[in-house]
From Swiss-Prot:
HAMAP family: TrmFO. One of its GO terms (molecular function) is tRNA (uracil(54)-C5)-methyltransferase activity, 5,10-methylenetetrahydrofolate-dependent. This is Methylenetetrahydrofolate--tRNA-(uracil-5-)-methyltransferase TrmFO. Keywords: Cytoplasm, FAD, Flavoprotein, Methyltransferase, NAD, NADP, Transferase, tRNA processing. It comes from Maricaulis maris (strain MCS10). Its main location: cytoplasm. Its cofactor is FAD.
């Protein structure tokens, strides 16, 4: 790392003391770069937080699976540990019994992160709201204000980025792994064969239903257990534009087949003489073509119910879900359009964004983006450059998705994403295990994931060494 200059000693401002902001702060000061961390809690609260502690966990106390061999979020844990993440280090220290998951004592965890950062000689914590974009003399800023970004700052970001580039609700449709769809029942075709290329004319996977299947599906949708909006979500005025599929079903049994499930402009090559009563369409969700989302299927069904109901769709009986659906109060940017590969706002490169605000979902994913934002900003301040982590790593796959790997297909197409193996470049399927035995059947999937994880950690080590 180059010798620190006077410019390097100028502090970097981090706005937001949640998971991403706390991690970004730690990564910066670990490189010798001073930080002013701005956190409004303690002066102004939010509708969901209960304390003024840094890295407060407002929902679950789980960081999800800690299995780094066959689980993508577990792999992300391991990568972050190897990069000296304060969130993972203090998470491990506050660990509770949770089987293969990493669950933490939320109070112990938040208090430990707060103590470590507040006592660090290079950290200044400023308890104040930043109600607008930072002043021009703040030449390097990381904005990590999360899903409950204050109204005034949200308005300032909206003004800078343009109408429609900042969302206030996510409307998440379920996403399935392409290789788990039964193409003996489903087929590729765009409505009315629209498109200039063969790929465009076959851009959608179509799952047909006859009348009995459709009626049973509607019954299941209406009967399924739903999650209720929290009071602070229900009172947010941006919800009307993204109705859950079950609400559409409740408004009329024919509503869906005249909406997202309309069976027009499509012919089933498996049964061309029979017109489907309804059709569920899946659209490619990432550039690799490994993930497909269910078009128009944002939902408030509980996760367990989603699996049961959605596997009633012909062709999805054995579907594996990379992401289940949901609708939540959220604030996030259209990052693939607005941010560069180093998380800088293209229109104002002095501003970096991190955490849920850039369109990742989950505590660990948010902290991971804070980790990268902090490292990028530190390198820049110190006159160095930092190449992005390889796309084969969990960190690289996730940042690649939010800054360019997602396919932009119209307003609202970019929605928050958890880390999952569908974001990674494919790998050749292992054929034998460590003992030389042939890998068969259900053992193939964990073997492929283990190979992806091994590749990721090897490539991460090379990136660190470089």
């Amino acid at each position: 790392m180059p010798r620190m200059t006077d410019q390097a000693m100028k502090p970097i401002h981090v706005i937001g003391g949640g998971m991403a902001g706390s991690e970004a702060t730690w990564q910066l000061v670990s490189q010798g770069v001073p930080v002013i961390l701005h956190e409004m809690r303690g002066v102004k609260g939010t509708d969901a937080h209960h304390t003024d502690g840094l890295a407060e966990l407002v929902c679950s106390n789980s960081f999800r699976s800690d299995d780094h061999r066959t689980n993508a979020v577990g792999l992300l844990h391991e990568e972050m540990r190897r990069l000296d993440s304060i969130i993972l280090r203090q998470g491990d220290a506050a660990r509770l019994p949770a089987g293969g998951a990493l669950a933490v004592d939320r109070d112990v965890f938040s208090q430990a992160v707060t103590k470590e950062l507040s006592e660090h000689p290079l950290v200044t914590i400023s308890r104040e709201e930043i109600p607008a974009l930072p002043p021009e003399d703040w030449d390097s800023v990381i904005i990590a204000t999360g899903p409950l970004t204050s109204e005034s700052l949200s308005e300032a970001i909206l003004k800078e980025t343009g109408e429609g580039e900042l969302a206030f609700f996510d409307a998440i449709a379920p996403v399935v792994y392409r290789d788990s769809v039964n193409t003996e029942k489903a087929w590729f075709q765009s409505r009315y064969d629209k498109g200039d290329t063969d790929a465009e004319r076959k851009a959608y996977l179509n799952c047909p239903m006859d009348r009995d299947q459709y009626e049973a599906f509607i019954d299941a949708l209406i009967a399924a257990e739903k999650t209720e909006f929290k009071e602070w979500e229900a009172n947010t005025p941006y919800f009307d534009g993204c109705l859950p599929i079950e609400v559409m079903a409740e408004r009329g049994r024919e509503t869906l087949r005249h909406g997202p499930m309309k069976p027009v402009g499509l012919t089933n090559p498996h049964n061309p003489t029979v017109k489907p009563w309804a059709i569920v369409q899946l659209r490619q969700d990432n550039a690799l073509g490994t993930l497909f989302n269910l078009v128009g299927f944002q939902t408030k069904m509980k996760y367990g119910a989603q699996g049961e109901v959605l596997r009633m769709i012909p062709g999805l009986e054995e579907a594996r879900f990379a992401r289940l659906g949901g609708i939540h109060r959220n604030t996030f940017l259209n990052s693939p359009k607005l941010l560069d590969a180093q998380l800088r706002l293209k229109s104002q490169p002095r501003l970096r964004f991190a955490g849920q605000l850039i369109g990742v979902e989950g505590y660990v994913e948010s902290a991971a983006m804070g980790l990268l934002a902090g490292r990028y900003a530190a390198a820049e301040r110190l006159g160095a450059s930092l190449t992005p982590p390889p796309a084969t790593t969990a960190l690289g796959a996730l940042i690649g998705h939010v800054t360019g790997g997602h396919l932009i297909s119209g307003k609202g197409s970019f929605q928050p994403m958890n880390v999952n193996f569908g974001l990674f470049p494919p790998i050749e399927q292992p054929t034998v295990d460590a003992d030389g035995n042939r890998i068969k059947g259900k053992a193939k999937t964990p073997a492929r994931k283990a190979a992806m994880s091994a590749r990721a950690l090897s490539d991460l080590a090379d990136w660190q060494a470089g």
